[in-house]
Amino acid sequence: RTYLMGWGSILEMSSSVTQLTASGDVKDTWNRPLRDLRISVIDRCNYRCPYCMPDEVYGDGYEFLPRRHWLTPGEIKRVAGLFMQLGVTKLRVTGGEPLLRKDIVEIVSGLNELPGLDLALTTNGALLAGLAGELKAAGLKRITISLDSLDDAVFKQMSGEKGNIANVLEGVEAARIVGLSPIKLNVVVQKSKNDHTVLDLVDHFRGSGVIVRFIEYMDVGTLNGWRLDEVVTSKVLMEQIDERWSLKPVEPNYRGEVAQRYVFEDGQGEIGFISSVSEPFCGDCHRARLSADGTIYTCLFAKQGICVREQLRAGASDADLIGLLQNLWRHRTDRYSEQRGKETTKKVSKSRIEMYRMGG
């Protein structure tokens, strides 16, 4: 028997779980289906962004996961395939910084062999220029690149003095040349840190085909010193941008899309706003997360997860693993962003998992 600890109970599950069919959906306690999977392939990063991996915590002596604990490309592919049997159709490879894995092209190639999968990757772009062609050839369709400012001093501060804007822009151009599409740019906005550079960034990418998306600064993990008064809401940003370039809202591409989409009325492209703090979207969250060491989380703000690495390496059957995943999702109750600020949430906040471990 396998025992799942957490979520207020012990879920006892027999090893004789019946395997679901490829079309078998599973829903959580709030009737939310499982559609998206984020796979963090590495817990390391070449940046030290203060809102994710502050350098004073993750310095030179910090002990990350032993490499032997990382899931192999074959294990990653297997788990992704099992998730697809429960309804997953969209998969995003993340980190840490995923391009730091020497076998990242092999990982992408293996995932691309899974039929009917919408495959994307999120990166800080620092290493993308040299890998874009190989990733595209391996089957990568879409890419999202993090870039918090085009002001060199601001960018250096927000990357922990590790980033180089020129490298990121070279990565964006390389992605465009090889045909990765769409290319999205994620911008985390903090008050008095980079909010004054937002309009310049929009101006730079308007008309380029790159979709810029602004993300409200979130209280992911416990080490980034998050404060509500440092959040710049999507409403404020949208009004600032709309004052300079008229915007028009457009329908989401699919139910559960996290970004609110707008297009420029003059036809110069699209931007988006991700409002996890001011307008939580828990009710339509269909996403699970798999960490580099094989731990599965059901929320970005999770306090705990279930590790399947040992089961994978001990010869567990697909039926056993699917039953485990099914039970995990069926008992999912997460609605943290909607509960943010309540006393019960504040009491447990210090145990949340850090973002670099489960993928942003």
Segments predicted by a language model, with ranges:
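Radical SAM enzyme [4Fe-4S]-AdoMet core and its adjacent flexible, acidic
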Residues: 153, 162-169, 173-272, 276, ...
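Glycine-centered loop/turn positions within well-structured domains
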Residues: 47, 152-153, 280, 306
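Canonical Radical SAM [4Fe-4S] cluster-binding loop centered on the CxxxCxxC motif
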Residues: 29-71
